[in-house]
Amino acid sequence: LKRINKLIKNILRTPFEGIGKPEYLKADLSGYWSRRINDEHRLIYGITKTDLVIISCRYHYAK
């Protein structure tokens, strides 16, 4: 949980760069970004003009 909170704080400051190796996603998740929580789990998120939208905090993309 600490790692996720740290990632969220970093995303709010710099949405497309920083810790967790930000990666722009393609195909079904086009328009979203991912960051590594650890080797197994990814934080998948999107950014609007006013909000951070988190769509997943578990597994690598979808399981």
Where are these regions (language model features)?
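Acidic-basic catalytic patches of nuclease active cores, encompassing PD-(D/E)XK
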Residues: 12
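Enriched for short, Lys/Arg-rich terminal
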Residues: 1, 6, 16-19, 25-26, ...
